[in-house]
Amino acid sequence: MHIFKRNYTKFILLLLLSLFPKTILFAQENSLKTKYFTIYYAQDCSLAQLADRLHAASFLHIDIFPQQNNVQDIQSIVSDLFDSLYLEVSDIIDIHMYSFEGTIRIMPGREELREILGAYFKKVPNVASFYSHANNTIYFSWPDLTLGVLVHEMAHAIISHYFVVPPSTKVQEILAGYVEYSIRKKAGLQVVK
């Protein structure tokens, strides 16, 4: 009976998350629409910090924080950055889906991420990010979000939507790891071999 209640509770939580994702767990967040993603982020997540963390200047070839008064709109910079990274990931794995639309949720911390993961796993892993194919959403912990983590999860999203029968977990991890390596190298970041 206990197993039934636990599975029933998970089912109800997943159902509610898929029907009313913004109203249940994500009431204190902002959103940003890009060509390929709708990004929901915690109120304490600064878009300027996000652009800096993701090394926007490396991919958009702009000065994010100009010294003069011609400051660009940070929302358009972040939007362009996510779309540019999506296209870069697509180029690396040679999978191009221009009609792709996904969701990204940047959670305030790992505890909030663990709450969501509890709906998917009996034993909740302590991870910085997670891609859910079921609702086409990438989840991140704000303190742990880096360029490498973002493109790794983007690769999972692209791979999951391209193949009718998704590759094994090991193959997906190899491809996502290669994407992460390639992007970090292109951005001039330290590459772990």
Task: Name each region found by the language model.
Residues 11-22:
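Bacterial N-terminal signal peptides
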Residues 148-161:
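Active-site recognition of the HExxH zinc-binding catalytic motif
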Residues 25-29:
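Boundary at the C-terminal end of the N-terminal hydrophobic targeting segment
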Residues 68-83, 140-149, 165-170:
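Soluble non-cytosolic domains of exported or imported proteins
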Residues 166-193:
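Post-HExxH zinc-binding segment in Zn-dependent metallohydrolases
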Residues 2-12:
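Bacterial N-terminal signal peptides that target proteins for export
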Residues 72-134, 192:
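Auxiliary, metal-adjacent structural segments of Zn-dependent hydrolase domains
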Residues 33-73, 158:
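Acidic/histidine-rich, surface-exposed loop or edge segments in extracytoplasmic proteins
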